[in-house]
Every structure is written in C-alpha cells, then in structure tokens.
A protein has these predicted regions:
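N-terminal, polar/charged subdomain of small-to-medium soluble alpha/beta proteins
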Residues: 32-33
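Extracellular/periplasmic, surface-exposed regions of secreted and cell-surface proteins
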Residues: 1-26, 36-249
Length: 249
C-alpha cells in the first residue's frame, strides 16, 4: 500500500504445509529378525507446517545528489511438525497385514510433536552519492523460543560500502569499470527446539499401558545464540568495454 509518493507499506504471509503417510509390510518369513518371522506392519503419519509473516515499511527519497532508502520490518516464523508411528509384528492370521490382526502386546505406538517460533525486527539503510559512493547499514534483533529466557534475544548488525572509482575517469574504450568494496557482518542463529531441556520420553507405548525412559541426549539450559562474524574486501575491474575483467575477494 503506497502511503505517499516515497513511503510504502507491505505485508506478506505464506504457509508451507504437507502431509506424508507411508506403510511398510514385511510378509511372513520375509525378515531376518526372529521376532518378525510371522510378519511385521508399520505406518508413519507426518504433518509439517511452516508459517511466515512479514510487515515492511519502505521509504525512498532523493535529496540533491543522494539516493536514500530505509526499510523497517517485523517478521514471525512458526514451525510445527507432528510424527505418529505405530508398528506391530506377528500376524495372527497369515497374509492379513492389519493392526486388528496383531495381539496388543506386539503393538507399539509413538508420537512426537515439535514447535518452534522466531520473531524479529529488522532495518536496512542504503545511501548512494552520484553513483560513486555506496553505503549499506543493517540491523536485526531476534527472539527465539528455543533458547533460555535470558539468552533468547540477540542482535546482529552489518555494514558495507563500495567506491566506484571508474566514475572519476573520463569515458574510454580501455578501462570500463572499477570498484573497491568492503563489508563487515554478524549473523545470529538459534538452536533446535527443546535443546535446553532434559526430559523423559515414551520410546514404546503399549495399548495395555505406557512406558517412559531417559533420553540419550542431555539438554543445556545455558545455551547462547551462535554469532558468526565475517569481514570482506574486494576489487572488481573490467576492460575493453567489459570483455575482459576480474573480481577478487
């Protein structure tokens, strides 16, 4: 939505969702394991859903020889997955692969549900002067559900600039283009869902009762966001109307 001739408001929302079901049947005498010699049946139901929402305010303005652009935004990402598994072995009646054809003691049920949410605010400022000098500043702050409360907020900025020095030279057929650039950036990253907790889980769930066990993985309640820092310098030059050139980073 165009608020003014230089100010625009944009909202985007998208969803990615899929369902997957698979069924595996091992006929009698078709397995190596002795307990499966009278047949085995397994079914998996997987549901995945990813929701993304972005609200952006964009401003573009030209002031004398300067082109100025500002972007402010807010985003939300929500990821959910559900996996339901059930298995059974030792068919009562031969060649009839059905869970109704398996004793309760030989059935296994397992359910796993995962949810993760990430919310962020971000901004980008871009400025250029006479197609000669360019400057870009960015910053983003995220809040994640996968880290401890004290560490779930993290900020990461970046700065980049370039100088097109070929604009200072008169136009000629030999030297076509020359630019030097430099940038510094930080990128933040969270972790997987439930990585901070150690909990019991139900590896096998019988129809006649339930069972729980300790996980082989121990959670870390002191996890912090991962911050990656990078610095880049580069030189790009082209000659003979762009036919020959190089780009070094």
């Amino acid at each position: 939505y165009k608020l003014t001739d230089w100010l625009t408001l944009t909202y985007r929302m998208g969803m990615d969702r899929y369902n997957m079901t698979d069924r595996t049947v091992i006929a009698e005498n078709g397995a190596v394991a002795p307990e499966f010699q009278k047949g085995r049946l397994s079914e998996n139901d997987v549901t995945y859903e990813y929701l993304n929402s972005n609200l952006m305010l964009t401003a573009s303005k030209r002031v004398n020889d300067f082109d100025l652009n500002l972007l402010l935004g807010q985003s939300v990402e929500d990821t959910k997955s559900t996996v339901n598994r059930r298995t059974g072995y030792k068919f009562i009646v031969s060649d009839f692969p059905s869970f109704d054809n398996i004793n309760d003691g030989n059935k296994r049920l397992q359910s796993n549900r995962t949810q993760k949410r990430l919310m962020g605010v971000y901004g980008e400022f871009r400025a250029s002067y006479k197609s000669l000098l360019y400057l870009t500043l960015t910053g983003r702050n995220d809040w994640t559900s996968t880290l401890p409360v004290d560490n779930r907020s993290y900020f990461y900025p970046s700065i980049g600039s370039s100088f097109v020095f070929s604009e200072l030279f008169p136009e000629n057929t030999i030297f076509s283009f020359g630019k030097v650039r430099a940038s510094w950036a930080c990128v933040g990253k969270d972790t997987d869902a439930y990585a901070t907790t150690t909990s019991l889980f139900a590896p096998l769930e019988f129809l006649a009762g339930t069972g729980v066990g300790n996980s082989w993985e121990r959670g870390n309640p002191y996890l912090k966001p991962e911050i990656t820092e990078s610095t880049e310098l580069g030189l790009e030059m082209r000659f003979l109307k762009g036919r020959v050139g190089f780009d070094v980073t």
